[in-house]
Amino acid sequence: MPRLLEELTAVILTHRDAPLDVVGSFESRVGEAYQILRGVVDEAVVLATCNRFEVYALPRRGFVETVIGFLGEASRYARILHGMDVVRHLFRVAAGLESAIIGENEILGQVARAYEEARRRGVAGKYLGLLFSQAVRTGKLVRSRTRISYGNVGAPGAAVKLAREAAGGFDGKHVVVVGAGEAGSIMASLVREEAPTARISIVNRSVDRARELAGKVRGEAYGLDMLPKLLAAADVVLVAVTVNEPVIKRSMLEDVGRHLVVVDISNPPAVEQPIPSNVYYAGLRDVEKVIKEVLAVRIREVPKAEAIVEEQVALLRKLWLKRGADEAIAEIMRYANRVMEEEVEELVSRLRGLGVDGAALLVARSFAYSLTKKLLRPLILYAHEAALEGSLSKLEEIAQKYRDELARRQH
């Protein structure tokens, strides 16, 4: 049955309108959400992340009230969108334009996985399949045609960028990563991705954690006691630790006796000041400056990204209307074929009674098929024109009449 684009509805709760802890509390409740949607949707997809909880649906009666009830007190922060506003919002989400950090990439995978989960649960049909596949396509197009995802706006990524530029790349270099926590892990992974031939040494208070990370990046693991020896052989040092006093002393750096690149994103700093002249040093302020520069590039790309989104929103509208027209035509053809089959069977029966041979009967059947198609051709052309003009509601009325008539004939 064709569904009008105007029926498309979404209940939106995001970081832009609600406190993060409120939004994040629904991230683990996707299963509950699908449970309460039973009976109030024909199709649905739940998109839940730490920054957003969104329910997209082709609704039945009571959908909005059910979702609002599920949100409870958080419902005062929710927005309800319909039709093209739903399409535009989802496409902007997939493009990274609605993210807390403009252009972040993770959301694109989250949108794709949300649809796959809905499909696995049997609640995402062909219409939301079309919507979400086009949303993912839009997100990819925006990222390939603009610099909306330029650079890395996380401190670890920015630190690696600074170190790369200062050292002239990492290939063939000895990179020491001090700290095996989340930030250290990101930095070590980025270095390995960029430089297959780099030697990576992981230094951490807990050698077991250092070994765990080293195993992931094809590196070596050491305790803090090995720092002086490792610094003497290092080309680049990346630091991300939580300490009360510096773990890299000025004397250690002076003993190196040659050029060394050190980037420290620890707060407070983990490298003792002042820095010797043989060391290129970048701290958290330098890293934050890089992040601001990256964000400035991304922000300049927003108008281009928005233009692509609008192009794809218009395309989705055409695809949706065409799908509706195809379904309406299929309804009409089902009715026409049923009537034709009945009439042909009656004609064949009569002709047999008149002694008409088998070849003539085949001709009669072929003629009936051809006549049916020719008679319906103007209606089919009208259906496609109506879809392009957005007149799907009238077409649906026509299809419904054929559907009702077919049901009557079957009974």
Swiss-Prot record:
Gene3D superfamilies: Glutamyl-tRNA reductase, N-terminal domain (3.30.460.30), NAD(P)-binding Rossmann-like Domain (3.40.50.720)
Keywords of the record: NADP, Oxidoreductase, Porphyrin biosynthesis
Record's keyword annotation contains NADP: yes
Molecular function GO labels: glutamyl-tRNA reductase activity; NADP binding
Binding site for NADP(+): G179, A180, G181, E182, A183, G184
Domain remark from Swiss-Prot or TrEMBL: Possesses an unusual extended V-shaped dimeric structure with each monomer consisting of three distinct domains arranged along a curved 'spinal' alpha-helix. The N-terminal catalytic domain specifically recognizes the glutamate moiety of the substrate. The second domain is the NADPH-binding domain, and the third C-terminal domain is responsible for dimerization.
Entries under PANTHER family matching the protein: GLUTAMYL-TRNA REDUCTASE (PTHR43013:SF1)
Family to which this protein belongs: Belongs to the glutamyl-tRNA reductase family.
Note: During catalysis, the active site Cys acts as a nucleophile attacking the alpha-carbonyl group of tRNA-bound glutamate with the formation of a thioester intermediate between enzyme and glutamate, and the concomitant release of tRNA(Glu). The thioester intermediate is finally reduced by direct hydride transfer from NADPH, to form the product GSA.
Official protein name in the record: Glutamyl-tRNA reductase
Organism annotation: Hyperthermus butylicus (strain DSM 5456 / JCM 9403 / PLM1-5)
Lineage, top ranks: Archaea, Thermoproteota, Thermoprotei, Desulfurococcales, Pyrodictiaceae
Gene name linked to the record: hemA
